[in-house]
């Protein structure tokens, strides 16, 4: 498959988030000429998330094991494209998101994964941009410190299918108390993760709610502890230097 014929599969794990999912899928439908398939992974929804996905022409698969890691992994396994994009149900991709994902991989043939940032689409309007920048700025700085390289942001990233296949047996997909994007970042790191300011999505500010933030912090800590001390950041950096040399 030549670079100019890369196919993009978009994976969206969901549980009981039909309203947000409809907005996400509507945004993807407007750029469908750049998307080979959309895969929605239903992780035990009791609302009409699956029906919403089918109305927008998405492929729906069911993952019975609870947790985003299990659902996302099932979606990646099912993807048929050479590039696998990942959005959350509350992600609202920009009108050129899919085209920019494909363009990035065309231009960077040795990069295995690329991630971008986000802006909040709800909450106080005056705080949407600054709040998202503070939240994501802290995420990228702190998690990069734990990893020794750029982390993936689960609401907005894409990777080569070949990169996923190389680590799919290693990730902790059955652990419901981790951040799947952080876990995947630990395993994909040696293969090359890059940040692109050109990949834009909107997201909900729900992670900043009291309960949501506490849960994210717990998951983040567990995601790191699972990989330390064997993958302390300076050891990972040194391993990459030796590999490059």
Feature-to-residue mapping (PLM):
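N-proximal low-complexity "stem/linker" segments adjacent to membrane-targeting elements
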Residues: 1-27
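Short, acidic, metal-binding catalytic loop of nucleotide-sugar glycosyltransferases
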Residues: 26-35
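A conserved acidic beta->alpha catalytic loop
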Residues: 42-50, 91
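Glycine-rich, basic loop-to-helix element that forms the pyrophosphate-binding segment
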Residues: 63-79
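Short beta-strand-to-loop acidic/aromatic patch adjacent to the donor-nucleotide binding site
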Residues: 81-92
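Conserved donor NDP-sugar-binding/catalytic core segment of glycosyltransferases
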Residues: 96-127
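Short, flexible, basic/aromatic active-site loop/helix in glycosyltransferases
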Residues: 116-121, 129-150
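Acidic donor-binding loop at a coil-to-helix junction in glycosyltransferase catalytic cores
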Residues: 175-184
């Amino acid at each position: 498959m030549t670079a100019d014929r890369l196919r993009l599969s978009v994976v969206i794990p969901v549980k009981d988030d039909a309203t947000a999912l409809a907005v996400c899928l509507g945004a993807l439908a407007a750029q469908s000429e750049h998307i080979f398939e959309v895969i929605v992974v239903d992780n035990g929804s009791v609302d009409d998330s699956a029906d919403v996905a089918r109305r927008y022409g998405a492929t729906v698969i069911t993952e019975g094991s609870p947790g985003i890691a299990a659902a996302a992994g099932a979606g990646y396994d099912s993807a048929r494209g050479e590039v696998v994009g990942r959005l959350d149900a509350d992600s609202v991709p920009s009108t050129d998101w899919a085209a920019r994902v494909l363009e990035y991989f065309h231009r960077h043939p040795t990069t295995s994964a690329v991630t971008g940032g986000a802006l909040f689409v709800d909450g106080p309007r005056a705080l949407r941009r600054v709040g998202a920048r503070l939240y994501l700025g802290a995420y990228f700085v702190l998690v990069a410190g734990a990893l020794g390289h750029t982390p993936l942001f689960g609401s907005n990233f894409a990777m080569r299918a070949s990169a996923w296949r190389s680590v799919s047996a290693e990730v902790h997909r059955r652990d419901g108390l981790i951040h799947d994007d952080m876990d995947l970042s630990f395993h994909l790191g040696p293969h090359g993760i890059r940040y692109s300011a050109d990949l834009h999505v909107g997201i909900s500010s729900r992670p900043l709610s009291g309960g949501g933030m506490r849960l994210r912090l717990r998951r983040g800590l567990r995601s790191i502890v699972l990989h330390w001390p064997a993958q302390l950041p300076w050891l990972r950096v040194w391993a990459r230097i030796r590999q490059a040399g």
